[in-house]
Amino acid sequence: MSAYSMLSDRIVMAKELIKRAESLSRSRKGGIEGGAKLCSKLKAELKFLQKIEAGKVAIKESHLQSTNLTHLKAIVESAENLEEVVSVLRVFGYTDTLGEKQTLVVDVVANGGHTWVKAIGRKAEALHNIWLGRGQYGDKSIIEQAEDFLQASRQQPVQYSNPHIVFAFYNSVSSPMADKLKDMGISVRGDIVAVNSLLNHPEEFQLSESESDDEGQELLQVTRVDRDNVLARVAFPTEIKVDVCKKVNLDITTLITYVSAMSYGGCHFVFKEKVLTEQAEQERKERVLPQLEAFMKDKELFACESAVKDFQSILDTLGGPGERERADVLIKRISVVPDQPSERALRLVASSKINSRSLTIFGTGDTLKAITMTANSGFVRAANNQGVKFSVFIHQPRALTESKEAFAVPLPKDLTDDSAH
């Protein structure tokens, strides 16, 4: 293939990848964190290729063997093949085995955070030789990178379990390397190819021009990867085995939302209070109770004494008869535990968003190793800003409204029918 033909193909590929990356970013409600960064990296590659096309940059085959574009394509394809992608090109901080602060870029974070994917576009030959110490100075082998991923993942638990790591190879991986990764607990995706025994005449194994891939002569070694001998083709694991947390800690906002008349059909009103009218409109668009029920299903429910006490106090003041009845039923399903905030929760500095009650509730969930259900996203963000990340399930809030219905204006019947539950 001529250089100009290769250039044309690369430009087409870059344009297609930009469209796919933009579509990917739109595929999740609220977008995918890092989606804009991925698109901008692809656009930068396209811009560079177009400069070459316009004659502003001298055409070189090394430019066209763009490892950047190959890697970015691998990221897009990985994200397209996974469920619940929450971010791409996500940077995590961690402490290495020597106690030094490091950062790690995870190409795709999927399955709600439970899966970390490293997408690898380099060829199996190059990866294998780097692993054997035959790469260029400073090249880090895939196995060394895997150790970094494991170290970082242990420091970034999601719902109290470490993310599962997948290394996705888009230009194959040698069988010995794949075996080593599996032994380390890392899943491998891609073609696993054989490695031939020692060659008596390394010069027999010459690379075509299209296989140069920036590695140059480093591939002329005494062992070779046999790309044609594919031992296994491994797709992305359809189900990543994750120790799903079965404990749920209920915040006051969740207790209120769960029993609110608004969550049980009482959303067809215009209330005197603007915030209640807005919540009713949200409820007509998207019911919150089914989301709570689905998350709570088959899980053990907890609430700390402070949460239950304050919930009962709010009920006594604002709750209607139906809301109080539902509260009695709900409390019987819950194990009420003493307040026991975790040490890291107690280290939080008080602010407008971090008060002692929220600190106690979220901190008790942390001690229980439970996921805290809450509508208090402000506290979660404020704690995160102080470096404390709680395991949470965030939902929209619903206030106690049964006693307010008598003073509210019912919506016309045609509007009620259009948005009926």
Swiss-Prot record:
User: Which superkingdom is the protein from?
Assistant: Eukaryota
Pfam families, per the entry: DUF1308, DUF5614
Q: Name the InterPro entries for this protein.
A: DUF1308, DUF5614
Q: Family assignment?
A: Belongs to the UPF0415 family.
**Name of this chain's protein:** UPF0415 protein C7orf25 homolog
Species name: Mus musculus (Mouse)
Q: What is the lineage of its organism?
A: Eukaryota, Metazoa, Chordata, Craniata, Vertebrata
